[in-house]
Amino acid sequence: MEIERKFLISKENLPADLNSYPHHRLEQGYLSTAPVVRIRKEDDNYYLTYKSKGLMTREEYNLPLTKESYEHMRPKADGILISKTRYLIPEKDGLTIELDVFDAPYEGLYLAEVEFSSEEQALSYNPPVWFGEDVTNSGKSVSYTHLRAHETRHDL
């Protein structure tokens, strides 16, 4: 079970010392969006992820892939592949902020996620002042949808 909240972050509110935090390079593509079926490369590891419907709480299954399997599925992804750097920032109460900084063509999009052990913990979470809009329960809560909205704004 995945229980998380998501927040948009503005560039001017990003922590100044991002590279001092542990981070990973990610590339991902969506094979399906309803339900979410995603392939992801995280550094030198590869995964197939299934996510059930839901906003703050949903089922999530991560299955390891070989590099060959990932490369085979890559061309089947819907739309372009998404590249980003994920920074792991320690947060109060033993939590971790996963801050995604997207590469082109979505450069300028920053999304923070915080995972919780219970819905009660998630609902009582008071985010840091540098967080922006809470998009957990909006139609924008899925990264894929965020990217489509960001793409539309840049096309105007």
Model segments located where?
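Charged surface patches that recognize polyanionic ligands
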Residues: 8-14, 18-27, 31-111, 116-141
